[in-house]
Amino acid sequence: MSELNLMPAVLMRPKAPKLGKRIVLERITFIWKRLSFNQKVTMRNIFRYKKRFFMSIIGIAGCTALIITGFGVKHSVSAVVDKQYHDVLKYDALVRLDDSISTSEAKKYQKNLLQRDAVNNVEYVLNQSIDILKNKEDLYGTLVVYQSMENISNFVNFKDYKTGKKLVLDDDGVILSAKTAELLDVEVNDTMDIELSGTKYNVKISGIMENYFMNYVYMSQNLYESVTAQDLKVNNAFLTMKKMDQSYKTSLEKYMKEKNYGNLSYINNIGEEFDNQVQSVDLVIIILIVCAGALNFIVLYNLTNINIQERKSEIATIKVLGFRRKEVYDYIFRENVILSIIGSLLGTVFGYLLHRFIIRTVELDVTMFVRSLNFTSYIFAIIITLGFTLFIDFVMRRVLNRVNMVESLKSIE
């Protein structure tokens, strides 16, 4: 409103630059004294144009956050297969036993399997679909009951999803997958209801493990028989292999068919199927990264161009005062580099929060993606942002060289 009180002739003239003020850094004397003249001028200019300062930082931080999110989502999706089928599930093959095979017959087959050159360990389990009951709607899950606890670590890695500490499957309670616990909103020592073959059972949760696919409930044989009052009848066998050569696979498959033992499937085949499905997601993520990089370039270019156009008179003045070309470049572009560094660092915080929000939003009830950001996502995002900054500074040198000292100084008149 103050412009309404001014004369038209005054309004036609460009606004005078803001007066310089003491900045916070000047009060920290042991740092301020060690700065050169040009560095002091840069710091003053950064804090003098507060609107541009915040606009630049927010714009750069937003672009950096998008790049971090792109790299982070790619890692979160692509790392799931390796995590699930190498870190969590450690067996190599799964055999679905024929319904006619009894538990005693299964033990006999176990000895025969262990005599095969390809097989290292065999573990029999009950693998059965269950309903996990919750307030609003039931969850589809899988109950896995281990017959033996001796070599269980060879087949599955029971690791606490928060602390990473090893969990022990005992007769006190079940071990629940992390995503399932999150959906049920339960913690260790809570109880939960499961429905098995139409009968409802209440069990205690003794541990919550890291898991990425399906809603798993792990139980010991003693606990299963105690809860259900039924004897355990195994229906699956987990195998760990000495070698995964095709010749060994072919030999084992032939043996299974001859003995009418059951259907054999390999874990790595399941992982490959998921990888093929994820490839289409990779394309979307690459587009996101490219668009975020392009947006970063556009924001930096426009901010730099506006900065130069608004300060033509100032640039002309320092040229008249005898600043060399390199000194003029440093005078303007040093601010861009500092603002880019600050914006990039702030963008890492925004990127972490945005990545966390997106991953939690796109997860399904039976899937949990890797929620942690790998360090390289931050590094790549900062390098891309600073790389664009230096490239734009190089391109905008031509604009600085074209600033006409006489015309820029006369424009005020």
Functional labels for PLM-detected ranges:
Residues L6-I23, R398-E413:
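Short cytosolic juxtamembrane segments of multi-pass membrane proteins
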Residues V73-K107, N235-N236, E413:
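Membrane-interface junction motifs in transport/secretion proteins
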Residues D282, N296-I338:
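Interfacial "coupling" helices/loops that link adjacent transmembrane helices in transporter permeases
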Residues V73, V77-H86, Y248-L295, I306-E310, ...:
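Peri-transmembrane interface segments
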Residues K51-S76, I341:
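Short, strongly hydrophobic transmembrane alpha-helices
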Residues S56, K83-D87, K107-D190, N202-K204, ...:
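Short beta-strand boundary microenvironments
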Residues S2, D330-Y331, S344-E407:
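Short helix-loop junctions at transmembrane helix boundaries
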Residues V88-L89, V168, I208-M244, N268:
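Small-residue transmembrane helix packing/gating motifs
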